[in-house]
Amino acid sequence: SESYLTAELDDGVVFQGFPDVGDRLLGVIGIQDKVDVFLIRHAYVRTLARRQGIGGQLLDHVTQDIDKPFLVGTWKAAIWAISFYEKHGFKDVGQQETERLLKTYWSIPTRQIETSVVLADDRWRAR
């Protein structure tokens, strides 16, 4: 919704889009600077444009010139999302670290923490 998008923008989430030939977006990614890390808060590709490398291009675009680590949180059941991030070098940080990171960088209910996973890029593991 427009109000949710406005709240995300007000919270510092910056969006990048992948346009089609016209003005229509095929994909979008939103990242948030949390001082010592960046969070991938949103990543979506239109159904008709999936499996064409758009998500990977968006991910590469937003991560390439930033030295800070990137973290992404998602549902444990979102196997497709976990597979996508693993394909692009992200790794599961484990349950204890997931809980700590979700409490530190995200504002989500306890139940969501229990059913989520955090994946981190190489910069996180190199710290």
Label each region the model flagged.
Residues 64-77:
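Conserved GNAT acetyl-CoA-binding A-motif
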Residues 71-74, 91-110:
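Conserved catalytic-core motifs of GNAT/GCN5-like acyltransferases
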Residues 19, 43-50, 74-76:
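A short, internal acetyl-CoA/4′-phosphopantetheine-binding micro-motif in the GNAT/acyltransferase core
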Residues 13, 17, 24-33, 37-44:
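Conserved beta-strand in the GNAT
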Residues 45, 51-64, 87:
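Conserved acetyl-CoA-binding loop-helix of GNAT-fold acetyltransferases
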Residues 1-15:
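Active-site rim helix/loop that mediates acceptor-substrate recognition in acyltransferases
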Residues 13, 112-119:
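Short hydrophobic/aromatic beta-strand or adjacent loop that forms the aromatic wall/cage
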Residues 55, 59, 77-81, 97-105:
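Short glycine/proline-centered loop/turn elements that form peptide/ligand docking sites
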